[in-house]
From Swiss-Prot:
A UniProt-annotated Pfam family: EnY2
Entry protein name: Enhancer of yellow 2 transcription factor
Keyword Glycoprotein: no
Subunit structure: Component of the nuclear pore complex (NPC)-associated AMEX complex (anchoring and mRNA export complex), composed of at least e(y)2 and xmas-2. Component of the SAGA transcription coactivator-HAT complexes, at least composed of Ada2b, e(y)2, Pcaf/Gcn5, Taf10 and Nipped-A/Trrap. Within the SAGA complex, e(y)2, Sgf11, and not/nonstop form an additional subcomplex of SAGA called the DUB module (deubiquitination module). Component of the THO complex, composed of at least e(y)2, HPR1, THO2, THOC5, THOC6 and THOC7. Interacts with e(y)1. Interacts with su(Hw) (via zinc fingers).
Record InterPro entries: TF_ENY2, TF_EnY2_sf
GO molecular function, one term: chromatin insulator sequence binding
GO biological process, one term: positive regulation of transcription by RNA polymerase II
GO cellular component, one term: cytoplasm
Protein family: Belongs to the ENY2 family.
Compartment(s): Nucleus, Nucleoplasm; Cytoplasm
Amino acid sequence: MTICDTVDQYTIMSGDRLKIKDLLCNRLTECGWRNEVRLLCRNILLEKSANNSVSVDQLISEVTPKARTLVPDAVKKELLMKIRTILAETDEDN
C-alpha cells in the first residue's frame, strides 16, 4: 500500500475526505479553474465535433492533463497543508 493509498484510506475512515473535497471544490471555483475547464471542454467539443462525435471518455482523456496543470499552486499548497494538519492531529492523538 502506497502513502497516497494510506492517506486516502485514513481520510475516508476519519470523515475528513469530505471536508478536503469541499475545500478543493470551493477553492477551484473561487480561482476560476472550473470556468477555465468548462471553456476548455467547449473548445475541444467545437473543434472535434466538426469532424465527428466525441465520446465522454475521449473528452476526459484530453481534458484531464490540461486541467491538472491549470490548478493554481496556491490551491495545491493549501490542500497539502490541510492534509498534513489532519495527519499531524491524528498522530498526536495516538
